[in-house]
């Protein structure tokens, strides 16, 4: 009956974990408040994890991205230091609506760092979109005629962080630039 009530209130994560929560409450002789707190915390944790996975999927990152914790700035040829990477990981630039531009020749780790920051942002609750410039131009050109492109453009516009890769490699017309 408890599971059905939790599902009625769309507390799906808590409903799924209810047997474990009840067993833990019995073993620890939890009060009603402690049990209710555990149920609600379980639901919040489940929703946050689901949101994180959904945001990761919607970001369209390239394969094999790594979290920033796995980065050793010395293995990158970008010249970024540990101190700079630490400041960027705090995401205060994102809270202040700032922009970052990583520029340089291929092979420096610009995409890897940008995607690592994007992953950090998703784990901190932000929405992120990753697109290569060539694909972004296609999306802009076809957004009015193709449903999928229009949907993707809408997601890009709503994202709190947009990562555009390979900007300098793709020529764009004035009309495309002003969309």
Language model: regions and residue ranges:
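Walker A/P-loop nucleotide-binding motif
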Residues: 97-113
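Conserved nucleotide-sensing/catalytic segment adjacent to the nucleotide-binding pocket
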Residues: 147-179
